[in-house]
């Protein structure tokens, strides 16, 4: 089994490298692989290629790499925290909460630009903070509800209702926004990894990496929590502390990524199921790193599918993640009764 897992980890890692290079090559203008590799290695002499790669393609590919890992691990943590195979940052309304935070911040920036741009945070820390606060608020509400309602379906319904409430707040804010602000927010809400700048990456990368590192330190606690509260207590797990840590980690990762990429649906729900099916294990010592790698690989592939080489148009990335993610979840839940029963 260990040999099989090692081979799978190696194959996924190689897939990430290939998808990463292809993601840089493909676009409205196709770039030769040799020129791209030379540029990445610092040996490029092709001015146009170097400019396109370093200023547009490379930030986009890195964003896919980071966001895929972060969104997927957040989904795994949600499924473990709520012991629910359908738990996800989008289904539970956490993405909507982050969206409300960004919408409120954007509206405030429209009304009071001088106040928010004083420290130069108009498109950097302010957006991250607003998205994290929005995501954390919704997650705390869901956590409070789940402690009272032990019915999984009821918790999911509450999450969906919170998502509707968040959408209503966003609609009201959009009504009072000017045309330019409204257009900016709508484009953001479609979800995209293409608009991230190096400055934004400098903020997103360390925040998400800290969250991923924290998740890598918690597989033992996540294993205990996934087997039920009684078992977790019997092995000495501090359930309240673990839950708080999972809530904070998920909120920070989700808020930071959503702030710059917009809400990306189904990835956080589908990737953990895909990894469980592929690795045939429920051990979080395997699931956590496998989910991180698989999430990066799948979002790179989704980004590749959004763009047709030689064409100017780019599909919304949510269209691709939903097309790939929804069937995976449906097939896994329909074909694996044991997986459904494990979360009851």
Stretches found by the model and what they are:
Residues 1-344:
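Alpha-helical transmembrane segments in inner-membrane proteins
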